[in-house]
């Protein structure tokens, strides 16, 4: 029998795959975008950039920016009854509209 893999990217074939026309790195503006403390952001993982990538189970979740650490932002997400803190690179974040 083959032992089951428990890697970081397992079961993410659809979640972390890109359309062929969108291959490669995103535009530079996505790397340089800035967020304010208290701003709501969506976590949309950019699969071609691995630094500051959150766990894929949090792809599509919405959180609040609490601060900044280096290039990354400190984002709090409510998961069930707990508040979890993540350090996420801005390329994996999108601002919430409205």
Curated annotation (Swiss-Prot):
Family: Belongs to the eukaryotic ribosomal protein eL21 family.
Alphabetical list of HAMAP family matching this protein: Ribosomal_eL21
Disordered: annotated segments: 1-27
Keyword Ribosomal protein: yes
Keywords: Ribonucleoprotein, Ribosomal protein
Species of provenance: Thermococcus gammatolerans (strain DSM 15229 / JCM 11827 / EJ3)
GO biological process: translation
Basic residues: bias regions: 1-24
Name of this protein: Large ribosomal subunit protein eL21
GO cellular component: ribonucleoprotein complex; ribosome
GO molecular function: structural constituent of ribosome
Pfam families with a match to the protein in the record: Ribosomal_L21e
